[in-house]
Amino acid sequence: RQDVDYDLRKVRNEKLVKPIYFTQFPRDLDNLQSVQLKKETFIKIVLPLIVAENEKILDDREKLKVLIEKKFTSDAEKQWLRQKLLEYKVKKGNLDELLIRMDMIPVSIALAQAAKESGWGTSRFALEGNAIFGQWTWDGQGIAPLKRDGDKNHKILKFPILRASVKAYK
């Protein structure tokens, strides 16, 4: 319990976030009586996931910069580039566009949207599908909203763990 307990004011001042990763929200998060405690708990769960994803993006960005400067790339590097082009939905071979799109997630915006879309981690989508940001899907892989209009067929994307939701957010 002490490992998870850290002061968000210190995070704001020192910019250090403990690398503690929850795979899902606690089911009893909504039972917390204090709204302030509920919000702090939510931030302590989601913030490290966003920071970790940003670190991964920065690492990938540095790797991409190196590959752009190389005259020849290995088969493994070519495969990595193909995967990143798909991941960021960039047309084949447009590495300059990939570099532009491969950018950090704005932490404050991500936290605000996550809080709103997931009801501070207490929504059905957050609890049943680790869906933090409320991304829609039409391919059948998700959770159907209970009050969806009859003429609609979208679902909310479902994820195996919270980190996957953050990864998909970019």
Residue ranges of predicted features:
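Catalytic cores of secreted/periplasmic lytic hydrolases that degrade extracellular macromolecules
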Residues: 1-112, 116-170
